[in-house]
Amino acid sequence: MVKMIVGLGNPGSKHQQTKHNVGFMAVDRLVKDLDVSFTEDKTFKALIGSTFINQEKIYFVKPTTFMNNSGLAVRALLTYYNISTKDLMVIYDDLDMAVGKIRLRQKGSAGGHNGIKSIIAHIGTQEFDRVKIGIGRPSHGMSVINHVLGKFDTDDMITINIALDKVDKAINYYLQEKSIEKTMQQFNG
């Protein structure tokens, strides 16, 4: 069996450590202890790394398209590697959740997230596993775009690092147990 873990974000150094790139940050945290390195694949428009966990091939992906076109890379990789959408996990930011809160879901709408909208449009289903990481709402008077493209302040970064550790544990549990339901029971709350 093959699984694909996708972290959403925007490419380029100016977007590193921004709220919208928390999906990239989560994937980077996941691969840190697995001795996985990323290679840029221009054909698939993604940074791709892989390893085996319990005899199962796991692809870690960071699309190099901008957020709104994430579905291009996801669809191309699912097709090329013949991976079912049931074996897809997407990690992304959610501004409707408090900073650092995480929630695993089995399926659902895009909830206004353009990266998820793109994935749903390109793969033709809402039925794929996901991890949402809360980045909070913009402060009064700040636009959503400025909020998601802004960096975390020091206190929020501490909270996000704790959340990234929790996401790391949740994804590893998910890969061991091979069950989103069990993982949701263990980590949602």
Curated annotation (Swiss-Prot):
Its main location: cytoplasm. GO terms for molecular function: peptidyl-tRNA hydrolase activity; tRNA binding. The keyword Transmembrane helix does not apply. It is found in: Cytoplasm. The record marks D93 as: Stabilizes the basic form of H active site to accept a proton. Keywords: Cytoplasm, Hydrolase, RNA-binding, tRNA-binding. GO terms for cellular component: cytoplasm. GO terms for biological process: protein quality control for misfolded or incompletely synthesized proteins; rescue of stalled ribosome. It catalyses: an N-acyl-L-alpha-aminoacyl-tRNA + H2O = an N-acyl-L-amino acid + a tRNA + H(+). The active site is at H20 (proton acceptor). Pfam families: Pept_tRNA_hydro. Its EC number is 3.1.1.29. PROSITE patterns: PEPT_TRNA_HYDROL_1 (PS01195), PEPT_TRNA_HYDROL_2 (PS01196). TRNA binds at H15, F66, N68, N114. InterPro entries: Pept_tRNA_hydro (IPR001328), Pept_tRNA_hydro_CS (IPR018171), Pept_tRNA_hydro_sf (IPR036416). Belongs to the PTH family. Hydrolyzes ribosome-free peptidyl-tRNAs (with 1 or more amino acids incorporated), which drop off the ribosome during protein synthesis, or as a result of ribosome stalling. Catalyzes the release of premature peptidyl moieties from peptidyl-tRNA molecules trapped in stalled 50S ribosomal subunits, and thus maintains levels of free tRNAs and 50S ribosomes. Monomer. This is Peptidyl-tRNA hydrolase. It comes from Streptococcus equi subsp. equi (strain 4047). The lineage of its organism: Bacteria, Bacillati, Bacillota, Bacilli, Lactobacillales. The gene is pth.
